[in-house]
């Protein structure tokens, strides 16, 4: 009888490790949400390096098992969200922030905490449970919610607030990279006016005005959005629907907008944007993910994940070729892709 070969080579061990990692990939997502929900980065930020027992006293929980919380923090250290150092006097272990967890502190300019709470919301997981159905043309968000993402957001104050906080957080976070890209390539040279379509709270518009004082900037969004935002005296605010009309300007800005839509709707939006431009010299400025960009390859996984996420929402993240085809169908004469220090790129389309 042949003796079973129980030897496992390095490749098989690596394969096992890969499958185990993906099998429990959900754990990192849930732990990320949990640490933000508990405010652990905020606690350490406000109090400096803290011991486990000190950290427990600040948690928003009625009671906490020290042993279980130790296991909890051990996993977060493994995720490189926190580090452990030993106090030279007391010899106690203390937890400190890492560059990653510094991005999870609420209220900072560079905080992704609100975006984490949006992307890890239980309703997001509910939609992802229908991912296979997207392959035969179904719309997972509809299947999960019996409505579109936009109707759900408008009709649910809690979700609406989470979404708006996340969008404001993300815009604030990537604004320096956007402004730097616009400056480096002189994108706003000769531009006296710009409309930020879907500009929400006006974070990006305010950043543009501060960096380019010669530009008059307007924020356009749906009526219920414009009604609730705190107005900035440096900006004009316009309630409207981008599928109907866009105010005239030298440049139209669409940040993280077109990825919400399939090609036909994008072409409609782009055509309306083009109608708002002057007969010569106008430009549409897109801030969107370019899936196959060679810029910042560390973001490749995130870009591909966003591509899947937007597909579930009946949207689409696009490659260089797909952006080129889309802009050509919308009759733009040329375009330029500008890599920036962010997950997105700037795409300037010339009319």
UniProtKB/Swiss-Prot annotation:
Coiled coil: none annotated. S-adenosyl-L-methionine binds at residues 198, 221, 241-242, 255. It catalyses: columbamine + S-adenosyl-L-methionine = palmatine + S-adenosyl-L-homocysteine + H(+); (S)-tetrahydrocolumbamine + S-adenosyl-L-methionine = (S)-tetrahydropalmatine + S-adenosyl-L-homocysteine + H(+). PROSITE patterns: SAM_OMT_II. The active site is at 259 (proton acceptor). One of its GO terms (molecular function) is O-methyltransferase activity. This is Columbamine O-methyltransferase.
